[in-house]
Amino acid sequence: MNVERSEFLAGVGHDALWALIEGRHGDPFSILGPHESGGMTIVRVYLPGAEGVDLIEAASGRVVTPFSIAHPSGLFAAAMGSRMHYRLRITWPDGEQITEDPYSFGLLLGELDLHLISEGTHYSLSRTLGAVEMAIDDVAGVRFAVWAPNARRVSVVGDFNAWDGRRNPMRLRQSAGVWELFMPRLAPGERYKFEIIDPHGNCLPQKADPVARASEAAPSTASIVASSTRFRWTDDNWMKGQSRQQRLEGPISVYEVHAGSWLRENGGRSLDWVELSQRLVPYVREMGFTHIELLPIMEHPFGGSWGYQPLGLFAPTGRYGTPEDLAYFIDRCHGAGIGVILDWVPAHFPTDVWGLARFDGTALYEHEDPREGFHRDWNTLIYNLGRNEVKGFLIASALEWLERYHIDGLRVDAVASMLYRDYSRNEGEWIPNRYGGRENLEAVEFFKHLNSIVHERCPHAMMIAEESTAWPGVTKPPEEGGLGFDMKWNMGWMHDSLSYIEKDPVYRSYHHGTMTFGMIYAYSERFILPISHDEVVYGKGSLLGKMPGDEWQKFANLRSYLAFMWGHPGKKLIFMGGEIAQPSEWNHDASIAWDVLDQPAHAGLQRLVKDLNGFYKDEAALQFGDFHSEGFDWAAADDAVNSVLGMLRYAPDRSSSVLVVSNFTPVPRYGYRIGVPQDGVWIEKVTTDAREYGGSGLVNGAVSSESVPAHGRPHSLWLTLPPLATVLLKSP
């Protein structure tokens, strides 16, 4: 078909043509692809660097016509007598490529999807935005979509187009500020980013996809097209088993883990998810923990942040394998009867230029005003929770982990920093809310909405808050004015109890109230007692290093403290290495010091933690009082002189009970009388002074009660309290 060159550019203005050539055009579909003109169909393609292009009929494979050069910059055009399904045969300097034309496809995202994105209620965001493997009209490829409402132009770039932003500019869907493009014949594994021109015409550093489901391992920063093939889970019985409420009422003993440093091979290589499923999962099961809590595994640029400064909120870090490898690890955990909790960070994000910061050239995910949008403690940016799309982005991220990866719970990091506008700020450095107060009302509503949606869509999932203040109602339902979390870390108990146990025993009597104070508020929330990674870093030393005294006393103090914790109301959490009394504080670049288990004292502590977990899981009395005040009484709260504390834990019907008595001095107490509710023979189930744990072997065994009133109870036991030890006795 003979066509004049001017006809190839009919309807294309001079300014529009140069905007396309220079990579500034915001509506490429108005020029590229098939267009009706003068009774024929003109097809234009912009392929800088191509030597030639042929138009091929898709059905037959025959060459219809070669493309003509419409502009020497790389704009080619061809004419068809009537519209047909066609392909392009492109000749490059290094070979040929046959593909469909990305600009021959119509609108990709539905109006409902766009509406839900704008409303902040599109909870399956990774199935709409990001890179989605799919087929359109039997053409396989990848649909790219990204929210960048203030950009002048957005292109998808990757190895497939030599990272040239001129080659594949995207279509803007004005109603939602979302850019979209279908790239035929791309497959999972392709690297990509977005190239964005900001409102002022500046080309930004290429951006990783905020909703990517896979990423390159750091320090590389490209996003990766993830497969749409579903992992074949084998955990149906686990997922359909206990409800969240049943799990909350039962034993919860959490082993907190940094995946990269739990165990390293010679040479310092971290284990991958498959290897962790073979090593970590059997260990946790053998130790009797009910859950593993993983420090954040979302993609993050700086390993030294331990994952707490993530940028890929939908992508597992590539440090330990593929997304499918992570799913395999979780599946193996569930097969072993172990739940998986994930640390999740909606409070802030790092300032890396290839990430979310000023994503489209404006403060899109963050606040514009640094008094709201910059966190000086961490040099990070704060999410703008007043924006629907940002709230929806975060909630969709939470659901991604719970639904796609079968995560059993999220521990939400740095909640306090979100709840207070003046958090870690001086006067004049923060903006009050609309009522003049310091509360972040947008964050309050965000948490209520987050927890309501999670509980509605994921009945199995637990939501846990790391909230370091006394904000009221963290674990109350939203309909009762609370934030809706299931549990909260008891930071106050952790600080108080560690402060006490770090003191020389000679001074503990003066601080006795530190150990009893926690019970004043113990039932104001549903608490987890956390001895977390935060307590063994930044010069704080290891758990063992915090203990006073000589080596024997250090181990005795730590054994007694952990048994007191396991006997105290509240679910349990301990960071890896604490269960073996690792001598040095945690180093994320090194393995836990497993070789210390060759020493009896370390092996003894490990055995104690295992036995404490076993007794806790078997004994209803140690579970019921975690959240119910009728499941707890002080047996001896006021013996400051002897630094002795006694607790009674009750089963729901009070048919059985457990007595927990701690002697926090190095002086054995012989003939220590303590009141008990039941008559009969009480059996010592655990004593931290047992020889198998590294103690001196001063034990009680079976103890018959006497009809001698004590501590307001009609019966009492005549006990031997070993030095620096805790004993747990079960009622008849």
Curated annotation (Swiss-Prot):
Associated pathway: Glycan biosynthesis; glycogen biosynthesis
Catalytic reaction annotation: Transfers a segment of a (1->4)-alpha-D-glucan chain to a primary hydroxy group in a similar glucan chain
UniProt key word NAD: no
EC annotation from Swiss-Prot or TrEMBL: 2.4.1.18
Cross-referenced SUPFAM superfamilies: (Trans)glycosidases, E set domains, Glycosyl hydrolase domain
Active site: 413 (nucleophile), 466 (proton donor)
Any single GO BP term: glycogen biosynthetic process
GO MF, one annotated term: cation binding
Keywords: Carbohydrate metabolism, Glycogen biosynthesis, Glycogen metabolism, Glycosyltransferase, Plasmid, Transferase
Record's subunit section: Monomer.
Family membership: Belongs to the glycosyl hydrolase 13 family. GlgB subfamily.
Job description of the protein: Catalyzes the formation of the alpha-1,6-glucosidic linkages in glycogen by scission of a 1,4-alpha-linked oligosaccharide from growing alpha-1,4-glucan chains and the subsequent attachment of the oligosaccharide to the alpha-1,6 position.
Name of the featured protein: 1,4-alpha-glucan branching enzyme GlgB 2
Organism phylogeny: Bacteria, Pseudomonadati, Pseudomonadota, Alphaproteobacteria, Hyphomicrobiales
